Amino acid sequence: MWTGYKILIFSYLTTEIWMEKQYLSQREVDLEAYFTRNHTVLQGTRFKRAIFQGQYCRNFGCCEDRDDGCVTEFYAANALCYCDKFCDRENSDCCPDYKSFCREEKEWPPHTQPWYPEGCFKDGQHYEEGSVIKENCNSCTCSGQQWKCSQHVCLVRSELIEQVNKGDYGWTAQNYSQFWGMTLEDGFKFRLGTLPPSPMLLSMNEMTASLPATTDLPEFFVASYKWPGWTHGPLDQKNCAASWAFSTASVAADRIAIQSKGRYTANLSPQNLISCCAKNRHGCNSGSIDRAWWYLRKRGLVSHACYPLFKDQNATNNGCAMASRSDGRGKRHATKPCPNNVEKSNRIYQCSPPYRVSSNETEIMKEIMQNGPVQAIMQVREDFFHYKTGIYRHVTSTNKESEKYRKLQTHAVKLTGWGTLRGAQGQKEKFWIAANSWGKSWGENGYFRILRGVNESDIEKLIIAAWGQLTSSDEP
């Protein structure tokens, strides 16, 4: 019996000793974690700890023996420090002023609640009251030790990117730095810019290409392959809402180069349109494609090299830097030198009246293959800004406040070809190849693919083209 009691007592004492060691070692574990983020402090002596200035124990109070509640924020290391006697060991986790205050003062102030400085913290950094920082498209102000942020819907939204990339939609989304910090409203206001088509434009009779109905259309076609060096890549409209000007100038330049069989291959100037298309001109605040084509026919454009894009789009308010006059024989000539004085050629390029191509998929393909790229007026929604690669189709936001996150607006692009791919399930997926005007860092080197034959985003609803206005001396 006595032997059993001794075993029981021994087991109890062993357990108590083990628990005490575990308890005492906990601060050691915390200490290791505490100093992992600041290795210089871990290796340092008491002298190194002294380089941090501030009142910690002096504000918080000192504690006898061990007191794990005797702790306060150590802001310089973005961690915690202690003001009890237990902290003063070989690897000290004491606050910087422990030795100068707790050891020297004979009477310690009473133990108080942790002291926190005025202001706010963000990612370990301290900000004073009234500081303002940006969180994507929202401004946050430090007020009463809390961040108070505006509640705008941002153009770049991580949850929408994640939704697209996790879903089986056939395309992938990306966070673009040029869109970061913009609200959804700003994106639609500054990155599109084509006004809805006028009734006159929509009432135009559709024309069909002269290719025979039995023409065998290839599965894959790209205009730049058929006419190398005669078509033009995407430019970047930046925050100038003028897709109406960029798409019109690009389609016209391609058509003139193809029609002249490579004699005139200059890209035409969208800035010329933005600054000079005077009647009802909105410039970088949107415009109409019918007015753009009117200007090309009546006044003409110079090359992009002659009239390049302004770095500061507010400069468009200074008016038109180019003018032309008729020679009485159907041609117009510039009356001013190029705004870019390095470029000497100020030749004026003109087009015939625009015509509407049939919305039939096959007819659009025939037109592109026979005469060159065409202009398409599409409807852009919020997910399109995130497009990186694949065959685009609109993905509806699953956000609970979905209406707040949805917008729809007109945009003008250039269709340059088409193709077909096998989908994940083995089915055929047809697509158009289109050039956007958001620079080559967006999408597939400035281009995008979009579902073909189903009028995705109204891409096939309104197709516009034109002929170059060439005199007999211009033609090859």
UniProtKB/Swiss-Prot annotation:
SUPFAM superfamilies: Cysteine proteinases. SMART domains: Pept_C1, SO. CDD domains: Peptidase_C1A_CathepsinB (cd02620). GO terms for cellular component: basement membrane; extracellular space; lysosome. The record marks R49, A50 as: Cleavage. The keyword Glycoprotein applies. It is found in: Secreted, Extracellular space, Extracellular matrix, Basement membrane. Residues 59-107 form the SMB domain. GO terms for biological process: cell adhesion; proteolysis. Glycans are attached at N38, N175, N314, N360, N455. It has been suggested that the active SMB domain may be permitted considerable disulfide bond heterogeneity or variability, thus 2 alternate disulfide patterns based on 3D structures are described with 1 disulfide bond conserved in both. Expressed in the kidney cortex, small intestine and cornea. Belongs to the peptidase C1 family. Antibodies against TINAG are found in sera of patients with tubulointerstitial nephritis, a rare autoimmune disorder that causes acute and chronic renal injury. Mediates adhesion of proximal tubule epithelial cells via integrins alpha3-beta1 and alphaV-beta3. This is a non catalytic peptidase C1 family protein. This is Tubulointerstitial nephritis antigen.
